Regions:
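Thiamine diphosphate
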Residues: 1-164, 169, ...
């Protein structure tokens, strides 16, 4: 068996920016002294005159990005999720969100898989913070192919976009000729009739593996990748819930305010359904190797399999 190709979506971000930069002179990239980590250094090397290092001043970076947007530029402001969504939240809300400016926020190192950097750098709340800002699009791609497509879609969309990327290399699962990325549209990766599992980001590949284990036990799981958490694919959520009668959500984020909450918001109004949310259960993270943390917090394939099996019984 050939080895599965793995790429960190932060790498995809840097590479996609270069691809877009070659086509669009109005694209600028801002960073806050973390270009080597966010991988905007790839763009910086290719287009040094269009890369702005704002230093360790994330709030200022967002303000600069907002100003550039008013001048017709398309700025991608980049930092770790903890700083882009956390430290700079007020500026994102009031300077970008309120006037609905065409600013893109590239947030890397999101979730528990930041690993050894520990709880202070593991942003488990960013989706919740960003999806509540009126007019903000929130995207959490699952692999290299989807991340590149998401960056392109963000550029083409007129308005603020929050892009969530990871530090850890993840399997490429969308490497097929018919793959198509559409903002606000979920992707059915596996058909099933017993339970619908909605997942996003890093957890997509783990959920697919869990579904195979469930199938061996006679549980037919439908797996749906929700790359765009806002606007969310309400029609697909309702249809899958009605088809299976049981719903599970899986995310590398707090169970409060993230994908699980977004799915429940839809179902509460349109198709009340029993839901099991799998994610970080209202706790902070900790320092440790990323793969060990993913397992400890129950986001690996084996843990997902066990939780879904217990829920469906």
């Amino acid at each position: 068996m050939s080895e599965v190709k793995k790429i960190a979506t932060r790498e995809s971000y840097g590479n996609a920016l270069v691809e877009l930069g070659k086509e669009h002179d109005n694209l600028l990239v801002l960073d806050a002294d973390l270009a080597a980590a966010t991988k905007t250094s790839i763009f910086q090397k290719e287009f040094p005159e269009r890369h702005i290092d704002c230093g360790i001043a994330e709030a200022n970076m967002i303000g600069i990005a907002a100003g550039l947007a008013t001048c017709g530029k398309v700025p991608f402001a980049s930092s770790f999720a903890m700083f882009a969504a956390g430290r700079a939240y007020e500026q994102v809300r009031n300077t970008v969100g309120y006037p609905h400016l065409n600013v893109k926020i590239g947030a890397t190192h999101a979730g528990i898989s930041v690993g050894e950097d520990g709880a202070t750098h593991q942003c488990l709340e960013d989706i919740a913070l960003m999806r509540e800002i009126p007019g903000m699009v929130v995207i959490n791609p699952s692999d290299d192919v989807e991340a590149r497509a998401a960056v392109k879609a963000a550029y083409e969309y007129e308005g603020p976009v929050y892009l969530r990327f990871g530090r850890l290399a993840v399997p490429v699962i969308n490497d097929n000729a018919d793959y198509k990325f559409e903002l606000g549209k979920g992707v059915v990766l596996r058909e099933g009739k017993d339970v619908a599992i909605f997942t996003t980001g890093l957890c997509v590949s783990e959920t697919l593996q869990a579904a195979e284990k469930l199938a061996a036990d006679g549980i037919d799981a439908k797996v749906i990748n929700i790359h765009t958490i806002k606007p969310i694919d309400e029609d697909l959520i309702v249809a899958a819930a009605k088809e299976t009668g049981k719903v599970v959500t899986v995310e590398e984020h707090s169970v409060i305010g993230g994908l699980g909450s977004a799915v429940c918001d839809v179902l509460a109004e349109k198709a009340p359904t029993l839901v099991k949310k799998i994610g970080i259960n209202d706790v902070f993270g900790e320092s440790g190797p990323a793969l060990e943390l993913i397992k400890k917090y129950g986001l690996d394939a084996e843990s997902i399999y066990k939780k879904v099996k217990e829920f469906v019984k």
